[in-house]
Amino acid sequence: MSGKPPAIFLMGPTAAGKTDLAIELTKVLPCELISVDSALVYRGMDIGSAKPSKEILAAHPHRLIDIRDPAESYSAAQFRADALEAMAEITARGKIPLLVGGTMLYYKALIDGLADMPADAAVRAELERQAEALGLAELHRQLAEVDPESAARIHPNDPQRLIRALEVYRVSGESMTAHRQRQFAESRGADAGAGGHLPYTVASLAIAPTDRHILHQRIALRFSQMLEQGFVDEVRSLRARSDLHAGLPSIRAVGYRQVWDYLDGKLTENEMRERGIIATRQLAKRQFTWLRGWPEVHWLDSLACDNLSRTLKYLGAISILS
């Protein structure tokens, strides 16, 4: 192993069993858990995010859970800073950071760093007004004219990323794509603090059922269980807050946006259930796309009964624990 301290990434699609395996690992390895999930950062969003129970969190603490109010935003850059700080604290105690979750953009930000992008609150507010007045399709058309690479990457119905890409261009006169390419070239060889390489030897694990149909069944079952556990009431409580609205990143989380639309009268209960399940399946598909391109990832089958021993064998084989 290199002179860098070890870290473990436990990735995978939603409903694959990541948390269960992570907890088992903490029982046999000197690991501490860091959540890598863009929905779990929000307080009061427990059922729809499949947040581990209070009992589980008390017995097996996860960092970066319940660190933001739903009215606040939380970016990949903020995650990277928080995760690096948590990893350093864990390593200083002689423990191994075990990062678990399915927000692949966060993992990428941690590994590759993020270019500092220009921002301007007034420009962003104007773009938000344009989105409301003209629609997201018009914003996507504008982005395609000035930054076709970003437009091809960003879904036309993703207001947060559309607005951010246009904001960067309007503030700096440079596309987000060009900005990233230039800053990446400038940061080659820099350390993690400057946005370069991660100062850890990382073991990348991914867990998922080998049969995609099984994952789809799990997703449908879990969404139904969330509804039985009071997911609609959870979203109803969020809607009762005057500072929350459907355009916030928290409320756009998979499942939450569908229940919000149901409570707004835009969907029937059956439509909400169906669209929530479909949106979760689409999320899983995007996660698989990320993982297929992830370098040196070791796959585990969710359906196997010996994933703990398989994981320990793999970690021993690559000498990350020595």
From Swiss-Prot:
Binding site for ATP: G12, P13, T14, A15, A16, G17, K18, T19
Reaction equation(s) it catalyzes: adenosine(37) in tRNA + dimethylallyl diphosphate = N(6)-dimethylallyladenosine(37) in tRNA + diphosphate
Keyword tRNA processing: yes
Pfam families: IPPT
Site entry (Interaction with substrate tRNA), positions: T103, R124
Cofactor requirements of the protein: Mg(2+)
Keywords: ATP-binding, Magnesium, Nucleotide-binding, Transferase, tRNA processing
Protein name, entry field: tRNA dimethylallyltransferase
Encoding gene, per UniProt annotation: miaA
